């Protein structure tokens, strides 16, 4: 019997043909080459139901785009941080120990508040 505990990658560009989509799919392919199942999705959807349904996940990689943290649009920054905080909270409520990684540009990591960074297992720099 084979147990499958995939890594979930959440990126709005996962299926896009732009540079971001190509980059996240390259990461996905590299993980799969190591023998780990990867499931790519394009949005968080309903946060609580997604976290509950994905109880078999072994880890989450959450992609954050630099555009979401454009300092000229503080409302967008606040919204992106709120959504990220809520999703991580739902994951931690379901499983306090599941590894969570952020994937994004190095400069984007500067905008992530410390309370979110403490919940992460790492930041994958693109």
Go through each PLM region and give its residues:
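Short, flexible/disordered intra-domain loops and linkers
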Residues: 14-22, 68-82
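Acidic, metal-coordinating helix/loop segments flanking the phosphotransfer/catalytic sites
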Residues: 40-59, 67
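Short loop/turn segments at strand-loop or loop-helix junctions that form parts
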Residues: 9-13, 60-70
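A short, hydrophobic beta-strand element within the central beta-sheet of small alpha/beta folds
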Residues: 60, 84-114
């Amino acid at each position: 019997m084979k147990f499958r505990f995939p890594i979930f990658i959440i990126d709005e560009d996962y299926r896009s043909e732009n540079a971001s989509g190509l980059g996240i799919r390259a990461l996905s392919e590299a993980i799969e080459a190591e023998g780990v199942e990867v499931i790519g999705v394009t949005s968080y959807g309903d946060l609580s139901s997604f976290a509950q349904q994905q109880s078999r996940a072994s880890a989450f990689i959450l992609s954050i785009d630099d555009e979401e943290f454009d300092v000229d649009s503080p409302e967008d920054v606040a919204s992106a941080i709120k959504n990220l905080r809520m999703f991580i909270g739902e994951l931690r409520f379901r499983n306090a120990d599941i590894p969570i990684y952020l994937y994004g540009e190095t400069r984007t990591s500067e905008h992530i508040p410390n309370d979110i960074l403490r919940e992460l297992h790492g930041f994958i720099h693109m």
